[in-house]
């Protein structure tokens, strides 16, 4: 029970990875969730009870972020961990495929949600300094490698890599700042409305089939499997030395081979192991 008595604020926590994080943290901690969907927040509170506080708001609004922080402190007395997680994906729309008439609006939408929303979340939380807390940014494999999105999403996520490092410096020694880069997952993450993708969810893309032969671990992880790295960084004792750390938590994308996703596909046969 390393997180017992802790209070956590998660943005974009009513679906997808955010919901999985809420479910994981609420087993020990109190959790506040900022999300735009009042309906999903109501479901969350019904499912998880008094240990969860749902707050309707837009991560692009600093006032909404400040209100979320204020309500979390009013309800739970403090904030120990902030997880800026809300985001949208550009569905790997290449630069040549971005319509000129939509480019400016799409850029603003992706960066306002995926970057400005993260900056607002931290700006709204001087309470983290008081609690000597920590920030855990959700990045993406696109923060480290190409082809995890189009240029808009990739640029936004690589901006968060820089943000982790800068804020880890600026907020030291009082607040630890780290980042987790999950890989592909089956979630409800949407696309930019400015590109006509506002109602499109990642779950409609056959990612599991696409990634099976690409990832060294041989499969696409379940959403819940990504939550462990966040729990580690949030745990004061285990992660006390960690600040400015970036974890590629993506099924081994960085070690895939030229001709095969995994080099040990024949190990069982070679070692005469029969599971």
UniProtKB/Swiss-Prot annotation:
Keyword annotations from UniProtKB, A to Z: Aromatic hydrocarbons catabolism, NAD, Oxidoreductase
GO molecular function, one term: oxidoreductase activity, acting on NAD(P)H, oxygen as acceptor
Enzyme nomenclature, EC number: 1.3.1.56
Record: residues binding substrate: 140
Name of the top EC class for this enzyme: oxidoreductase
Binding site for NAD(+): 9-33
Catalytic activity, as annotated: (2R,3S)-3-phenylcyclohexa-3,5-diene-1,2-diol + NAD(+) = biphenyl-2,3-diol + NADH + H(+)
Active-site residues, Swiss-Prot/TrEMBL: 153
Pathway named in the protein's UniProt entry: Xenobiotic degradation; biphenyl degradation; 2-hydroxy-2,4-pentadienoate and benzoate from biphenyl: step 2/4
Any one Gene Ontology BP term: catabolic process
Family: Belongs to the short-chain dehydrogenases/reductases (SDR) family.
Protein name: Cis-2,3-dihydrobiphenyl-2,3-diol dehydrogenase
Organism this protein belongs to: Metapseudomonas furukawaii
């Amino acid at each position: 029970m390393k997180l017992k008595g802790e209070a956590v604020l998660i943005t974009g926590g009513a679906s997808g990875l955010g919901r999985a994080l809420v479910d994981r943290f609420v087993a020990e901690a109190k959790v506040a969730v900022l999300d735009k969907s009042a309906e999903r927040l109501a479901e969350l509170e019904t499912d998880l009870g008094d240990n969860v506080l749902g707050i309707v708001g837009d991560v692009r609004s600093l006032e909404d972020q400040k209100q979320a922080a204020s309500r979390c402190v009013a309800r739970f007395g403090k904030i120990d961990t902030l997880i800026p997680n809300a985001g949208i994906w550009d569905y790997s729309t290449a630069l040549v495929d971005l319509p000129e008439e939509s480019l400016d609006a799409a850029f603003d939408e992706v960066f306002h949600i995926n970057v400005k929303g993260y900056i607002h979340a931290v700006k709204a939380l001087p309470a983290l300094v008081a609690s000597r807390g920590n920030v855990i940014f959700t990045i993406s494999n696109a923060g480290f490698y190409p082809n995890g999105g189009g240029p808009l999403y990739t640029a936004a996520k690589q901006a968060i890599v820089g943000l982790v490092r800068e804020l880890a410096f600026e907020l030291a020694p009082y607040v630890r700042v780290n980042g987790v880069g999950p890989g592909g997952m089956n979630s409800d993450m949407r696309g930019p409305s400015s590109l006509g993708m506002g109602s499109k969810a990642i779950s409609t893309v056959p990612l599991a089939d696409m990634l099976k032969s690409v990832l060294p671990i041989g499969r696409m992880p379940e959403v819940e499997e990504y939550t462990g790295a966040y729990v580690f960084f949030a745990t004061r004792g285990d992660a006390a030395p960690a600040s400015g750390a970036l974890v590629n938590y993506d099924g081994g994308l960085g070690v895939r081979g030229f001709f095969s996703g995994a080099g040990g596909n024949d190990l069982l046969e070679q070692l005469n192991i029969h599971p």
